[in-house]
Curated annotation (Swiss-Prot):
UniProt xrefs under CDD domains: PT_UbiA_Cox10 (cd13957)
Membrane topology per record: Multi-pass membrane protein
NCBIfam families: cyoE_ctaB
Gene name linked to the record: COX10
Protein species of origin: Eremothecium gossypii (strain ATCC 10895 / CBS 109.51 / FGSC 9923 / NRRL Y-1056) (Yeast)
Lineage: Eukaryota, Fungi, Dikarya, Ascomycota, Saccharomycotina
Location of this chain's protein in the cell: Mitochondrion membrane
Listed name of the protein: Protoheme IX farnesyltransferase, mitochondrial
Pfam families noted in UniProt: UbiA
Length: 435
């Protein structure tokens, strides 16, 4: 707004009023002001600046006035363009022009000088914990705790949540620290922090040690020793046995499935004894789910596993890989029925869970049937027909994988909804108004 007013006054000829509006922080304006003051002292007595029209004396020629006016206008226009760098003793600092490039570089100075944000410091360690997998492990423990027939407490729930999360983070951190050379060879794992050099293997081990000790201590103090022992054993099973067997034998998948079955046992043991058969149905559910989920995932990246040196069923025995995925998909039916049979859920859970289990079993069956056809003698020796069949097998494997991602939370949520006794109040006569 001041710039617009000054421009108007320049063109209208009221230069002194213009110099009152334009701030005296630009050297060119200071020069213009001094020039005007010297010229005015020869024409009339000194007076304060005001907005009145300039009175010209008779002895001032038109050429002289025009020359002074041109100098002042040029100085004012230069100031309004904000690109004058002329030094002046009237200012306590040098005026320097700053372009957009310097401003952009200035914004990046804190990062360039080594000052990192909290996310830049903590981000690699959060990735070490495999947050999505850790959340799934933590939720499976919480769901099992919620399904327990015994009463729950807030302290136990918080301790179980934090302790299970830290134990899972510890196991995943050790796993990444042991396999950077192998993870570097797979597209799926190339972005891991140890592979990218954001964290060294030793830093990953230290992170895992701190997480594991704190997590186990929280489970011991806030829940009970049984849950703490299960949490510590899960760290050892995943980071040592499973990780070591990945490069030796296909049985590694079965060991990995055990680590997925332990969190439900931890949740159940937080409030109830492990002698109840219902908790083993929950553990079996998580154990069986690992196979259709992982076998179909590994099928589509089987060549990467092979090149990285991981011994997986997907490339060692493709027919067995598909058969195992179907076998454990079908095992979901009796396990869910067992939850109703042993009084964990009501009888309607058998219907709901059968629909969800049937959805995954359908795609697992198509995957197995296609692989069985692809590796038959007639098709396997025909390269064109085999390649055509593998395209379909890849599609069915991908379908089964994504169905499994939705299947597990659906089955667990339905179990909580159908927990035994949850809806008894709706059908009871307690609290009924008496006429």
């Amino acid at each position: 707004m001041p710039a617009l007013c000054a421009t108007y006054l320049i063109h209208s000829g009221n230069l002194r009023a213009c110099l009152r509006i334009v701030p005296l922080t630009k050297p060119s304006v200071v020069i213009a002001y001094r020039h005007l003051s010297k010229s005015s002292s020869k024409i009339a007595p000194a007076a304060a600046l005001n907005t009145a029209p300039i009175e010209f004396t008779p002895n001032t020629s038109a050429a002289s006035l025009h020359e002074r006016s041109t100098v002042i206008k040029d100085a004012a226009r230069s100031a309004l363009r904000c690109n004058d760098t002329t030094p002046t003793p009237a200012l306590p600092f040098d005026v320097k022009r700053v372009d957009k490039a310097n401003r952009a570089a200035g914004r990046k100075l804190p990062a360039a000088s080594g000052v990192l944000s909290a996310y830049a410091l903590m981000g690699p360690y959060i990735q070490l914990a495999k947050p999505r997998l850790t959340v799934l492990v933590m939720l499976s423990a919480i769901c099992s705790y919620a399904l327990s027939p015994y009463p729950a407490t807030v302290l136990e729930l918080l301790s179980l949540t934090v302790g299970t999360t830290l134990c899972s983070a510890a196991a995943n951190g050790i796993n990444m620290g042991r396999e950077p050379d192998f993870d570097r060879q797979m597209m799926r794992t190339q972005a891991r922090p140890v592979v990218r050099g954001l964290v060294t293997p030793m830093q990953a081990y230290k992170f895992s040690a701190v997480s594991g000790v704190i997590g186990t201590a929280i489970l011991y103090a806030g829940v009970n020793p049984t849950v703490a022992l299960l949490g510590a054993s899960n760290i050892v099973l995943y980071s040592w046995f499973y990780t070591s067997l990945k490069r030796k034998h296909i049985i590694n998948t079965w060991f990995g499935a055990i680590t997925g079955a332990i969190p439900p046992l931890m949740g159940w043991a937080a409030a109830s004894p492990l002698t109840h058969p219902g908790c083993w149905c929950l553990a079996g559910l998580l154990y069986a789910w690992q196979f259709p989920h992982f076998n179909t995932l590994s099928h589509n990246i089987r060549n990467e596993y092979k090149n990285a040196g991981h011994v997986m069923t997907a490339w060692k025995n493709p027919k067995l890989n598909a058969r195992v995925a179907l076998r454990y998909s079908l095992l979901m039916f009796p396990l869910c029925f067992g939850l109703s049979y042993y009084g964990i859920t009501d009888w309607t859970y058998q219907i709901d869970s059968a629909l969800v289990n049937g959805w995954m079993s359908f795609w697992a069956f198509k995957f197995w049937w296609q692989q069985r056809y692809n590796y038959s003698k007639k098709v396997y020796n025909n390269k064109a027909e085999f390649n055509k069949g593998m395209v379909l097998a890849n599609v069915y494997a991908r379908k089964t994988f994504w169905v499994s991602v939705l299947h597990l939370p659906a089955v667990l949520i339905l179990a909580i909804v159908h927990k035994k006794g949850r809806w008894d109040w709706l059908f009871s006569d307690e609290g009924k108004l008496v006429a």
